[in-house]
Amino acid sequence: ILANSHYIAERIRKVWRREAEVLHPPVDTDAFTPVAGKQDFYLIASRMVPYKRVDLAAAAFRRMSGRTLVIVGDGPQMAAVRAAAGNVPNITFRGHVSKAELVALMQSARACLHIAEEDFGIAMVEAQACGTPMLAFGRGGSRDIVRTPEEMDAPTGLLFAEQTPEALIDAVERFEAMGGAFTAEACRANAERFSAAAFRQGLREVVARHLGHG
């Protein structure tokens, strides 16, 4: 059995009482590359559906007038997200954007946000491939994808423990206090762990182990 994250491997263990090997899905890291020059805004790009919890990002930044949030995406929960944001000037809605526009936003954002509990979370890899750190909810695939200061000397983001505006506000404040601890180089290097080439190599290794040769 193959699982796309350790989070899913643990669920397989609990529900089916079977062990699963983890093979992360491939991400087109060549399509998401860093550029020089960050701008002073945070980005969340998501479908507007309840489990994505974009409303929490809006509610948090409504209380952080000195921080700018750009929200990309559309969907059935858009009205609820707009209501959570209020009419504050530091939150901008971009709606649906092209892939090129999304890449440009990811490249220039100060950090990207991910509040959903995902099985994996490809967008988190795409953001880091652009050299952009992640602030993410610390359950699900984010634990495989985001490298925190507690784990390594070249971190790529922070994880927060609760899906609440308060937890996100705290994460933003911690991120700002850490200054230059999160580099584009570290983010890009981390994203390469999930490249198509890394996936092919991992799959070859799985096949070789189970066929008994390599």
Predicted features along the sequence, with ranges:
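Acidic donor-binding loop of glycosyltransferase active sites
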Residues: 107-119, 132
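A charged, aromatic-enriched C-terminal amphipathic alpha-helix characteristic of glycosyltransferases
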Residues: 163, 181-208
